[in-house]
Amino acid sequence: MGYVRMRRAAIALAVAASLLVCATAGAAEPRPGITFAAVGDTMLGNSPELPADPGTYLDAVKGQLRGEVVFGNLEGTLTDVSSSPKCGGSSGGSCYAFRTPPSYARHLAAAGFTVMNDANNHSYDFGKAGLEQTVAALHDAGIAQTGLPGEITVTKAGGEKVAFVGFAPYSLTASLLDLPAARKLIRRAARRAKIVVVAIHAGAEGSDAQHVTGAEEHYLGEDRGNPRKFARMAVRSGADLVLGSGPHVLRGMEIYRDRLIAYSLGNFSGFHNFATVGDLGASAVLHVSLDRDGPFRS
């Protein structure tokens, strides 16, 4: 009897082990997350002061600009238009109008960039013609662009559709000062893609603007919005990742409803056109992985 019981027990264990192996073999492996690399304010000079070799200017950081999406805020234009309506026909002095040749778009692409945000205070530095040339140059280089009024840019990453919407406190961009309109635009983006990334060019500027106040922020008398209020509204409306730029310093991050908000990624590249004294010289490349339905993974 003891032998029979033991034999039956052994058979039962063997069957259970076999079922466990089959179940494990049949279980689907977790799908990898979608990877992003993101940086803040980016330009490769300001004509006529340009790098001697623009093709190698970003070589030292190329290895960090790796992800299924590589994102930056284009703090300037890609144009050969030389007259700036913003500065009364010229740039310099206390008026800042930034441009590099349209051909520089290919250097951004070679460095790894796949998406650039144009919703900022420099996208119209050289008027409508300058902006149109910028958009065309990015397109020709294979870089997606976002940030114009009502614009939703959809790309693919990791086999999923990813929508980008850029906001800044200006009427010539998708405005972050009009919360109802912004909410509608983000919801539209969420209906068009699995993942929604919202870029915000918001908040005060300078070394004393490192902290998110939770209130309306201003710079030189200009309303730069309430970054925290806007970013959290964006998440509630469907954003899965919020990427901030504009203050020219690094700011904090938070996880809100399982979504990452990076309030400012600081200065990334300026070729002597950004102040880099003290905290203004701190930069970063943000590496993020999101689950395929949006939540922050790592």
Question: Which residue stretches match the model-derived regions?
Answer:
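Bacterial N-terminal signal peptides
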Residues: A12-C22
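Acidic, metal/ion-coordinating pockets
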Residues: G26-S298
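A general, composition-driven signal for non-globular sequence regions
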Residues: M1-G2, I195
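Bacterial N-terminal signal peptides that target proteins for export
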Residues: G2-L13
